[in-house]
């Protein structure tokens, strides 16, 4: 389960290969020359049995089991990520995915001001298990381009929530055209029925006048870089009378501005925010004790209200990258790592967190300054996508890693300066998928693969 540049070996699940992978795992963020690939750890008694969906460097949406074996693919779906849909949202049919169907090259047409040569989504859509298109969006979008990025969600009424970019001029900004973030509600025909534009609500996001001035004078046209958009979903806060958490309200986060916010779907107003200004993370062990007030979040991803029925339901779960962000950029620890935070959204207390130290490693052993995700699982584990290194894992509430997988399908290329072969294992986002969301009879296996303390360098 290793790859060696310039050649990558196929991921074969063998004890020796797994051991080599584990020996390298602590170095993953430093970019070792021998890279672990495939499943490197599995405790079937404590891991939640599931499939996992991700889009690798080979541009295939790939469904794997916990042994790391591919059970299904949807080829040629380049883009940010793929999402397998809850059958309850697609008339009980299993195995439908949201994917990017078609990209266009942004060079020369100024689709993304301030960036060189990006790929921009022209069309996104829904594919069934047989890879047939069941829904699409793009032709009826502005300029005939979906410009979807980062996130999307199928809604209970059959519509689709889409996070997109909108290139336009906005008065008061230094940039002639900004790359705005826009939320669309798209119906079954691909028509936009509702939209929300971020630049129209900057004054509602908690920025000081000085911060608003920095944003408007920024050289970065992608000034907010919203990377997450989800409906709140049913929750006990709303049931108790707190209208801010209405199930159809929307939660999003801005990576560049260190803000998490909730939008009232009916009024369009921002009704709840976390950030952009936080106290510093306490030094030493005080920064690991919970509960405590929320402290400095920076460059975060995948903010969501934990769904009803799961452990921690109603709390906010977020991958806190601790990447450079903020207006102005916030101070960050020189040798720090990333965190997964569970936050009570009303008291604004951190009630649980995960760092590498909870697994007996130095803080920097778990670090992804960009991309990444975290999801709560039915058995109380948390699924984590350490996106920068392409490492996926399940961790218990006590910090035990009970399943671990490293992307075996990196993006291969050539260095523009040296001409040497390159491999990039990063995964923007991966999704844990319940076994019964795939068609009946889809094969899966969960075979124990145990790491010894001598192999990991950390007690388990």
Residue positions per predicted region:
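Intrinsic structural disorder/low-complexity segments
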Residues: 10-13, 17, 269, 374
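Bacterial N-terminal signal peptides
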Residues: 15-26
């Amino acid at each position: 389960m290793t790859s060696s540049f310039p050649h990558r070996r196929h991921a074969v699940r063998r004890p020796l290969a797994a051991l080599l992978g584990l020996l390298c795992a602590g170095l993953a963020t430093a970019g070792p020359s021998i890279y672990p690939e495939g499943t490197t750890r599995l405790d079937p008694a404590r891991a939640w049995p599931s499939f996992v969906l991700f889009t690798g460097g080979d541009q295939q949406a790939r469904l794997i089991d916990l042994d790391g074996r591919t059970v299904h693919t949807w080829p040629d779906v380049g883009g940010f990520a793929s999402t397998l849909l809850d059958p309850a949202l697609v008339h009980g049919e299993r195995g439908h995915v949201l994917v990017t169907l078609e990209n266009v090259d942004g060079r020369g047409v100024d689709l993304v001001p301030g960036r060189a040569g990006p790929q921009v989504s022209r069309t996104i859509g829904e594919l069934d298990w047989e890879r047939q298109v069941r829904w699409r969006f793009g032709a009826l979008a502005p300029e005939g381009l979906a410009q979807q990025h980062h996130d999307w969600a199928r809604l209970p009424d059959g519509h689709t929530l889409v996070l997109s970019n909108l290139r336009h001029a906005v008065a008061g900004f230094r940039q002639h055209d900004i790359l705005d973030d826009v939320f669309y509600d798209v119906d079954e025909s691909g028509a936009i029925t509702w939209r929300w534009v971020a630049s129209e609500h900057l004054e509602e996001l908690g920025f000081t006048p000085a911060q608003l001035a920095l944003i408007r004078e920024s050289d970065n046209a992608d000034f907010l870089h919203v990377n997450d958009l989800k409906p709140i979903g049913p929750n006990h806060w709303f049931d108790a009378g707190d209208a801010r958490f209405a199930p159809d309200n929307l939660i999003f986060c801005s990576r560049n501005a260190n803000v998490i916010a909730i939008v009232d779907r009916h009024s369009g107003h921002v009704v709840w925010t976390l950030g952009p200004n936080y106290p510093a993370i306490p030094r030493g062990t005080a920064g690991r004790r919970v509960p405590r007030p929320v402290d400095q979040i920076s460059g975060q991803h995948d903010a969501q209200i934990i769904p009803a029925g799961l452990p921690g339901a109603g709390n906010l779960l977020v991958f806190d990258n601790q990447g450079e962000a903020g207006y102005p950029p916030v101070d960050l620890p020189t040798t720090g790592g990333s965190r997964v935070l569970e936050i009570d959204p009303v008291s604004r207390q951190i009630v649980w967190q995960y760092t590498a130290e909870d697994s007996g490693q130095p803080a920097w052993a778990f670090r992804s300054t960009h991309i990444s995700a975290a999801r709560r699982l039915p058995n109380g584990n948390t699924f984590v996508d350490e996106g920068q290194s392409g490492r996926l894992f399940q961790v218990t509430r006590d910090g035990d890693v009970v399943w671990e997988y490293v992307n075996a399908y990196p993006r291969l290329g050539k260095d523009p300066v040296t001409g040497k072969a390159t491999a990039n294992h990063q995964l923007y986002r991966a999704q844990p998928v319940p076994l019964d969301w795939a068609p009946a009879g889809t094969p899966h296996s969960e075979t124990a693969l145990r790491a010894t303390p001598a192999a990991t360098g950390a007690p388990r």
